Structure formats: structure tokens, C-alpha cells
Amino acid sequence: MQNSISQTSGTATSPRLIDVVKRLAPSPSHQHFDELQGEGSPWHNFFEQLGQTDLNELDRRTQTLARQVRDNGITYNVYADQDNPQRPWSLDLFPLILTPESWATIEVGIKQRADLLERVMADVYGPQQLIRDALMPPALVHGHPGYLRAMHGVSPVGGTHLHIAAFDLARSPDGQWAVVAQRTQAPSGLGYLLENRLLISRQFPQAFEAMHIQRLAATYRMWVESLKAHSPEGANAHVALLTPGPHNETYFEHTYLARYLGLTLVEGHDLTVRDERVYLRTLRGLEPVHVLIKRVDDEFLDPLELQPDSSLGIPGLLQAVRAGNVVVANTPGSAFLESPALLGFLPALAQKLLGQHLHLPGVDAWWCGERAALASVLPQIEHMVIKPTYAKSKLHGTFEAILGRSLTQAQRDEWVGRITRQPERYTLQAYAPLSQMPTWKNAKKGIVPRSVMLRVFALRNGKGLGSDAWRVLPGGLARLTGVDADIASMQRGGSSADVWVQTHADVDRSSLLPKYNSATAFKHRERMVTSRSGENLYWLGRYTERSENMVRLVRLCFEALNSETPASQNLWAWLQQMAQREGLVPEGLPATHSTGDAKNTAHMGGRRRVFERALIAGLNVGKQSTSVGYNLRSLQQAASSLRDRLSTELWNAIVNCVQQFSTDCAHASTPGKFSAVQAMQALDTASAALAGITGGQTDRMTRDDGWQLLSIGRHVERLGFLASALDLAVELGVFESTLEEADTLQDNTSHFAALLSLFDSTITFHAQYPQSRELAPLLNLLVQDDENPRSLAWVARTLRGRLSKLCLLYTSPSPRDCS
């Protein structure tokens, strides 16, 4: 596939899509295997199932897919893009389709390789006979930062080192699959491929059923059961997924995978080691953790024995592993297996350890630390891919893989010099042209070819050695190259595709839903709330309430500035001091109210314009910790650490609110121009969005301990803000002015209306005290009313109730002891 396939929009008599593809598809490339035109290609069946689907319909499905990706909050953090590191996940409309015969070859080869890596790992951290027999260079093991000396001689619980392994495959021009790389430390993709499957199968449900595509759920369930079986606790083992946190590039899939598999999502400081056992810090005390699926690199796992400045790990974790009290998947110390140099030694290792040839070949690789290899391949650097032997090593230096053919002669000479000076740092791998699969661009450009690399996963299916101890997930993650790229990488701007594996057998339609055998299985279970989650929920509540308060206060200021009826001097003093106290405008602004000075009064209009511009300019200040925009971003930051607890709709509402407010503020404040109208529109939009977010927190979250803390955070913030506002109003004589004012209640610049608006109690006051202008009803509503959720008494009573409930749970049987 070298050219694009395009077609004008379909009509009522549009030809079948397969006919369009057959007629316009170009001849296969001699440099790349063509998935579309290859022998026995399943694509013909796929397009047959689409029938008379026209290209505009494919465009509509692409748009639907992109919207679903956004709505589901699927992201991938790109470290190289400082301006926009968090990007929507890129997913192509068409899946990569594998025949049963092609998959059988992959499956057998991957099982064998996973078994081989397990045996290599056991030897390296045991007798090291492979090094003694000169089958592995010591420098590739002991010199690799991924080899952990602290783990030598450790026999992991259950006797298994590896529970998961990922392999990146390329299809050569002759149609044969070969291994390009292997990942064992913390392989990513298990969550993204699940989401890919969910989205793409919905786009082509008829084709998915008719083509007998294998399901994924049974393999995931088997893997979790295998992990539990390795623990002494067995089926009752508590399994947690250890994540570096929301700033990690694949954090979305950590939260998604934890939710899908029913795991507890934890960060390093959620865990502690006591008496050589791992515990989870929860609001109700310590809970044991028996199995830990880690997505943190090994070097950061234990600051006591590894990276001392790591804040991602758990002090004492390695000792808990030595004691056999926790299963870690994978056992720390497997990173050396990821070295590209090791690929060149695996054929001999397979002969030694398995007595077999490798069923699935690897792309040839040469470690330059061997003189003979260096002499033979360095002159061919133009046809090689240059890779670091010790990836991510601070000591040896690291870099992204480089295609020799992409270098100029001068650059190649420079690389030859580098490699010659320190050859052990470099590995040369033969360039493997990736196969090309059809991808959908749009109705104008049609179907275009993209090079693809396939990542497949081997998952543990029990204890012991042998290929039968592994199962290959019948699917995978297809990574497509970016435009004009030869290396598939999400960090380099590539995209992904679902992977469909056909079967001749019956499709296993198992799900992850447990089979309950008795009514006791349905008994109420308290959800564990980690201490970190509790803290983030508390601040989620505070920042939500604070954002709402700041929006109302700024709107009130703008209404006073732009009202036809001038606000009183006391009201101006109150609003300006409130804005300054909350940090919405800088200190030192000229007074917006009369101070008795005739000169001050004469320039009042100009002073208020300065105040208005300061309000607009400070709406979205990034470094000002009290701006509306900062509080909204802090709200999103707190929510990002709670993705496993928040609904997709609530998370999207928060993200959209922050993004929309930032966009609106940019329009309201441009160099030399400030627009109060656009600023008010930004605040109105944010206010409506925050109302939805509050509703989501109120009605879409379980009333567990975490929600109690969220509610406490909201009410602490509300009580502090409203009490402060009333205190300042009394100090400045606003209530005395209220007794004298003769404005109508509809005038938002009146003291009555201003106080009611800030307390969000305008409608309530009108309903309870129609046409009333008296101070007593106003104070009763704002201070003492037991049914107004904005009154100080209601907030204080509710806050006391929430605190008492938590106190009853943890310390005392009597609420009196908690007051």
C-alpha cells in the first residue's frame, strides 16, 4: 500500500466498499508487507461486512470515535510536549486483523519466549550458570542498571519471577513475524487495548461478530486468579496496582485497568511496610496488601535499598519480598531483560535452557561490546538501528533509537566514533521495515497505509515452568507510525489501533463478573478509602466550593461596576476589600469608594475602571493561588488523583470547565484590551459548569468515608468564606446601610441583593419573605435558618454531623466525645 484509496461520497446506488478497495488499492510494496493485499488477508471479509457503507459514513464513525475518546477522558501524556503534554489518545478507525493461522504462530512463539525469560531471570538471580558458561556477557547483567544486586538470591513467593511480559513484533516483507523488543519491568498497554476494543467493536459490531473475533475478558480474569494463587492468601488475596501518579504518561490506563479488574489503585505513599508485610493506609486503619502489580520502574520501588530520593516507592518493600509476604508483578530486577543487546543471545540461551530453537525469530541484534560483533556490523551502520544498550541509564547516557539510513554521512561518521570509543553502551539492530495496514484518513483522502508494530502480552496462567504456564492475550496493541516516521512510538506522535484475532473455534464469551453462589456474596462491603484519596477528596470539596465562591464574588463586582444604579460607598468598600482579601485583585489599588476627599471623589470613575481591569486581568493568573482559574486548575488536579473514584461524566465536566474558562479568559483579556462583557460570559459559563460538578459530587458518589471528607471540605470552605464576608459587612456598616436603602430588591447593587447573591440565597429570600426589606429576616436567613444550606447555622450543623460520623467510625461510640 503505497498510495491512498479515495472515493467520492456515496449515493443510494453506492458500490460495496470492498469493490472500491479492490479497484483502487495499489500494488503491494516490495519494502513492506501489505496487510491489506497479503496472502489470506482477512481484510476482504472485513470490508465485505461493511457492505455498501460509503466513505462519508466512515467519516461520521471517525468523528464519533474521536468524540468517545474525549468523552471517556482517554489521554496519553507526551513528555516532549511541554505546552500540551496531555493529549487525547489517538485511535484509528480500522483494527489490525490477524488470521487464526497467523495468531497460532505468534502464540506458540510468545509462550516459549516468556518461559525462556523466566528461566533466564531465575538463573541470573540464582546460580548465574549462564554467565559461567559464557552464554551471557557479565557486563550485560552486572553492568545493567536494571540488575538489582539486592535481589540476588531472593526466591519470590510462589517461585515465579515474571507474571507478565510484553513483546513488540514486526512483520517482515515475506510476511513472517519477528520480535523487535521485549518489556518486563512495567509493560504498558493492557488498559489502552481494552479501551480500544470497547470503542472499535461498537463501530463495527456486525463485522466483529461475523468474523469470530476472540474476546479478552477470560484471559484477564485468569491472570488475576493466577496472581492470587501465588499468594498464601489465595483467592482472598488483596491485589493493588501501584502507579507513579497522575503525571505518568500512561496514568489513564492505570486507573482504567484498576477499575476494570477490580483492583485497588495506590501510590507509593499509600503503602507502608510493617513487620515485613505491606499494608495500605486507609481511613479505617491499615489493610494488608498481598499482591502488587507495579507500574513504577524498579529503581524507584524502595528508597531504603535502591534510589534513596525516590518518592514513588515504599520503604522496606524489598525486605517484604524477601520474606515472601507479598507477590510483586513482576519481581523487581527484570529490567535488564529489556536490553536490546540480549536479543542476540536468546537463540543460544533457548538451546541451553529449553533444548529448542526459537519458534518466533527475533530481529538480528549485535551488542557492540563484543569485538567480533562490532567489527562485522559497524561498517553496515547505514542499514542498522542504533539503540542504547542500557536504556534510561543516567550513568551510561540514553537516547531514542536512531535509524542509520536517516543520518548524513557526517552524522554516521560521528556515531561510528562514539560507538568505537564506548562500544558497550550501544547495540545495533537490523532495520526491519514494518508491515503496512490500511487506516482511515477522511472521505477525501480515503484509506492510506501506515506502518504498524504489534505489542502482544504473555500473562501467567499458573505456577511452574514451561509454555503451558503462560497464556497470550488474544489481541494486542497496534502502534502506528506518525507521518513520515519509521519507528512506531506514541511519544513520537504515533497512533494506535485495535487488534482483532480470529478463531475457528467457538468464541469464549466469558466476562469478569464473578459467579455468586450464595446470597451472602451480595452483603454490603465497605469500599476502602486510602488516606491519600481521603485527602484529595477533602481538597476536591474545598476547591469546588472555593471556585464557586470566587465566581460569585467576581460576578457581584462586575454587576456593581456596570449597573445603571450606582452602588453605595459602603457596598463599594465591602466589595473591594473582599476582592483584595481573597486575592482577586492586588493590594494597593486606589479606593473605589469615597473617602471624603474631594480629589478622590472626582476621579472615582477612573479608579473603578482600574479596579475592573485588575479583576479581568486576574481571572486566570497562573501563579496567583487565589485566582478563579488557579482554583479551577487545583480542582482538576485534585480530581486527577481520584480518577478511579469519579465517573467519566464528572471528570469530563471538570476538564471541560477548566479548558473553557481558560479559553474565555483569553478572549476577555488581550494585550491592551479588557472586555467586561466577555469576562462576565466566562464567569456565567463557569458558574453553570460548577453547578453541574457540584451535582455530580452530590448525587453520583457513594456516601462512604471519602464522600464524608469531600463534604467536610466543602462545608469548611463555605463556613469560612461566608462568615468572613458577614464579619466584614458588619465592620463596614453594610447592615446599617441596608436599613436606609430604598432600592428595589431586583437591583443587584443594593446591599440586600448583594448579600443574598453572595450567599446564593436570593430565590429563597424572595420565597420566604416577599417584598420584605427588614434586616431581621435577612440575618435569620443568612445566619440562623435551619433549612437554608447557605446559612451559617445549617453549614455548622452539617459540618458537625459529618465530623461526628467519622469520629464514631474511628474513635468513640459517643458523638459527644467527638464534638
Name these PLM-found stretches:
Residues 380-383, 394-409, 413, 418, ...:
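Polyanion-binding catalytic cores of nucleic-acid enzymes and NTP/SAM-utilizing transferases
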Residues 34-42:
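N-terminal amphipathic, basic-rich helices that act as targeting or association modules
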Residues 62, 68-161, 172-174, 184-239, ...:
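Alpha-helical transmembrane segments and their helix-helix packing motifs
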Residues 162-165, 382, 424, 452-454, ...:
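Short beta-strand or tight-loop elements
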Residues 42-59:
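Short, surface-exposed, low-complexity cationic segments
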Residues 2-35, 163-164, 171-178, 182-354:
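ATP-binding N-terminal substructure of ATP-dependent carboxylate-amine bond-forming enzymes
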Residues 103-127, 145-148, 253, 258, ...:
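Active-site nucleotide/adenylate-binding loops and adjacent lid/helix of ATP-dependent enzymes
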